[in-house]
A protein has these predicted regions:
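Extracellular, repeat-based ectodomains that mediate carbohydrate processing or recognition
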Residues: 1-185
Length: 185
């Protein structure tokens, strides 16, 4: 749905994901780029809830249509955590997807980057100092903002044996982090 009159009226539903009966889709997020076009992230699964993928799909015509979903998590080991919601961060044509991954029950947070407006996601990095091994779903994902030359990211981790809220400062060019701080005493 979209509105161009302050919410007085709305368009009909506009499909963002593929119309593919062999897949399920859920956990959508939306951001609006500097031109007013929507960029949407969602999870894609097979019908039996296997093979989760973090997808990003963008519009270049204010949401009238979408270019087609791109798998933004493909360069991470394992697969995305199938029950943890991701988030998007935009910086001009750069799109950052923040998500929790599942590599044989290692549930670390990752950042994936597109430098071409979401057509490809070729750079990915694990942003955890310690591996969080848990045989279950943490049900949380990282959130972030752009600040100067960095991404500031907050996330949950239980890797040290304590349930903690952690803050990272990530270089937005190469995705390496300059520091990680526990902000939950």
């Amino acid at each position: 749905l979209k509105s161009f009159d302050g919410g007085l009226s709305f368009s009909d539903t506009i499909r963002v994901s593929e119309n593919n009966p062999s897949h399920k889709y859920r956990m959508g997020n939306i951001k609006i780029d500097y031109n007013g076009n929507p960029i949407v992230n969602y999870m894609q699964y097979l019908l039996n809830w296997t093979e989760p993928k973090q997808m990003v799909n963008r519009s270049i015509n204010f949401g009238d249509s979408f270019l087609g979903g791109i798998e933004a998590s493909q360069s991470a080991p394992g697969e995305p955590c199938d029950c943890c919601k991701a988030s998007l961060v935009l910086d001009n044509d750069d799109i950052f997807l923040l998500f929790r991954n599942n590599n044989s029950n290692e549930r670390n947070s990752y950042v994936s980057k597109s430098v071409d407006g979401g057509l490809t996601f070729n750079l990915v990095n694990d942003i955890d100092d310690y591996d969080w091994m848990v045989n279950g779903c943490p049900a949380t994902g990282p959130l972030g903002v752009v600040y100067s030359d960095s991404l500031l990211i907050v996330r949950r981790s239980g890797a040290t044996g304590n349930d903690e809220i952690v803050y990272n400062k990530i270089n937005k060019v190469d995705l390496n982090y300059s520091y990680t701080r526990n902000i939950d005493p």
